[in-house]
Regions:
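Bacterial N-terminal signal peptides
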Residues: 11-22
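N-terminal cap/lid segment of alpha/beta-hydrolase-fold proteins
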Residues: 27-53
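Alpha/beta-hydrolase active-site loop
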Residues: 97-118, 137
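Short beta-to-alpha linker loops that shape the active-site pocket of alpha/beta-hydrolase fold enzymes
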Residues: 84, 89-94, 159, 224
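Primarily recognizes the serine-hydrolase "nucleophile elbow" in alpha/beta-hydrolase
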Residues: 113, 122-177
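The feature captures the conserved acid-bearing segment of alpha/beta-hydrolase catalytic domains
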Residues: 163-213
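Short, surface-exposed "cap/lid" segments of acyl-processing enzymes
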Residues: 48-81, 89-90
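C-terminal catalytic histidine-bearing segment of alpha/beta-hydrolase fold enzymes
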Residues: 215-246
Length: 246
């Protein structure tokens, strides 16, 4: 009888070698998951979902007032509706100059950390005021595998230009000479659903009304640029997007 290496014996040999090469597989254990990227050096606030049935993770980049009334209230409203939120404090993060590419990589870290940790599939990107100016730059620079998971971008009170460092003069409405135009970055987000919220008294200043008709879903709300407690229409617009059955 020919005792050569038959296909059946070859298959058995390869399987045996694979089991010895991987003790976890030999023991019937699944392979260990890759470690989550660290986010300890970022000024983040965790607001876990308080209801089940939704698969979105929202990242909220705050205004230059930091984690304040509007950011807290909007995040809590979304969490009650089942959307987990990671708040990102712009005031602390942009105290030193950043650049769009580096900030986009930090957003990538946040998503690669919290998507698997909280078992979420889709991404909602929210920016308020200063954060709304910056968020399109970050969204347009995400790697393809994360970009395709972005189901909604919500911009609350965006202006024409963005700066990547906080200047106290901006509280007086004075743009920095280093600011960058926001419109070209929004144009890079073709195909993404965008919600743009603005105060009814800031119609002549908001970027929302300068965007091409039909490009975004407009959400007018009472008042001026400062949202305060008037975040209800914004929360409803976000919660009404992509609702999944529980």
């Amino acid at each position: 009888m020919n005792a050569g290496l038959t296909p059946r014996r070859l298959s058995t040999l390869l399987l045996t070698l694979a089991l010895f090469a991987s003790p976890a597989l030999a023991a019937g254990e699944p392979p260990a998951a890759a470690p989550l990227p660290k986010v300890d050096n970022l000024p983040l606030i965790k607001v876990p979902a308080k209801a089940s049935g939704r698969d979105e993770l929202a990242v909220l980049l705050t205004g230059d007032g930091g984690w304040a009334q509007t950011d807290k209230g909007l995040s809590e409203a979304l969490a009650k509706g089942g959307i987990a939120v990671v708040g990102w404090n712009s005031l602390r993060y942009f105290l030193k100059r950043r650049d769009p590419d580096r900030s986009a990589r930090d957003l990538e870290r946040i998503l690669r950390h919290y998507l698997p940790l909280w078992h979420k599939e889709k991404v909602i990107l929210i920016g308020y005021s200063f954060g709304a100016d910056v968020m399109p730059f970050l969204a347009s620079r995400l790697p393809p595998d994360l970009a395709e998971r972005v189901s909604l971008i919500a911009l609350v009170g965006p202006s024409d230009s963005a700066d990547f460092r906080f200047h106290p003069s901006e509280w007086l409405g004075k743009p920095s000479p280093e600011s960058r135009p926001v419109m070209p970055e929004i144009e890079k987000l073709a195909g993404k659903e965008i919600v743009c919220a603005y105060g009814e008294t800031e119609k002549g200043k908001t970027l929302c009304l300068k965007l091409p008709p039909g490009r975004v879903r407009l959400v007018p709300r009472p008042g001026n640029h400062i949202v305060g407690k008037n975040y209800g229409p914004i929360a409803q617009a976000i919660l009404g997007h992509g609702r999944t059955a529980s």
